[in-house]
Each structure stands twice: as C-alpha cells, then as structure tokens.
UniProtKB/Swiss-Prot annotation:
The keyword Ubl conjugation applies. Its main location: cytoplasm. Component of the nascent polypeptide-associated complex (NAC), a dynamic component of the ribosomal exit tunnel, protecting the emerging polypeptides from interaction with other cytoplasmic proteins to ensure appropriate nascent protein targeting. GO terms for molecular function: unfolded protein binding. Residues 38-103 form the NAC-A/B domain. Ubiquitinated by the NOT4 E3 ligase and the UBC4 E2 ubiquitin conjugation enzyme. This is Nascent polypeptide-associated complex subunit beta-1. The gene is EGD1. InterPro entries: BTF3 (IPR039370), NAC_A/B_dom_sf (IPR038187), Nas_poly-pep-assoc_cplx_dom (IPR002715).
C-alpha cells in the first residue's frame, strides 16, 4: 500500500501539536516512615512481656556515667524492670553532657569512683588557679609603667 507523503506530512504536523495519550501523573512516593523503628519497639515490648517486666512510674531522670567523664542524661525517662532476669530498660532520648554541666543536683547520684574523679578534678582546678596568678605577675613584669609626660617616640626612630 503506497503512502501519500502529503497526508503523512499533514498528520505529523497535527500530531506535533496534539499529544496522543494522557498525561502521566507522577505518583507520590511513600515517605520513609518510622515503621522499622516501631516494629523494633513492638518486638522489644513482646520480649519484655515474656520476662514479666514491671513499669516503674515517676522516674524524673536517669544518668549513665561513661568512662570518659561524660554523662548520658535522660530527662524524661520510662523504666521497665524484670528483676528476676536482672534486666532494666530505659526509654527516652539521651543527651550527652559533661559532668560539670549537671552540678550540683547530681552529687547524690555519684558513686565512689565518680566522687574520686571529682576530687581529682577539683585538685587540678586548684593547681591551675594557683598557677594562673603567678603567670599573671610574670606578664606584668614585662610591661613597663607609663609615666606622664614621657614619650617613646625618640626610641622608635
């Protein structure tokens, strides 16, 4: 079947102006949700239920002392304990803080190691403070006292 070139050119011209077929709608991808974290929480809750964990209410804060002197501080915390299995679970968002940031309210929570570290820190601070005034006096000796009417312009030239 022969194709008429004139009709073909006319059809191509019309098809260039008119789109054939519908517009494709972009499908919104499902946003990444916290379904994975929620799934982990449900697994954890089921395991705690198997251990007969008991929820402890009215816990204001919890602090975990790390070896490097930092403290993991839980401000609002949920606690579940399974004493027969020696298991404790703490829920919340921890903030890593320095030990100095939590004073003086944290002193009652410190163990013997932390109190010893605190006394060493205080001794270091006292040594540093005693050394600082001596350094300041040495710096003052190098600075000449200004006398009214005396200029150093001649010495500079």
């Amino acid at each position: 079947m022969p194709i008429d070139q004139e009709k073909l050119a006319k059809l191509q011209k019309l098809s260039a102006n008119n789109k054939v077929g519908g517009t494709r709608r972009k499908l919104n991808k499902k946003a990444g949700s916290s379904a994975g974290a929620n799934k982990d929480d449900t697994k954890l809750q089921s395991q705690l239920a198997k251990l007969h964990a008991v929820t402890i209410d009215n816990v204001a804060e919890a602090n975990f002392f790390k070896d490097d002197g930092k403290v993991m501080h839980f401000n609002k915390v949920g606690v579940q304990v399974a004493a027969q299995h020696n298991t404790s679970v703490f829920y919340g968002l921890p903030q890593e803080k320095n030990l100095q940031d939590l004073f003086p309210g944290i002193i009652s929570q410190l163990g013997p190691e932390a109190i010893q570290a605190l006394s060493q820190l205080a001794a270091q601070m006292e040594k540093h403070e005693a050394k600082a005034p001596a350094d300041a006096e040495k710096k003052d000796e190098a600075i000449p006292e200004l006398v009214e009417g005396q200029t150093f312009d001649a010495d500079v030239e």
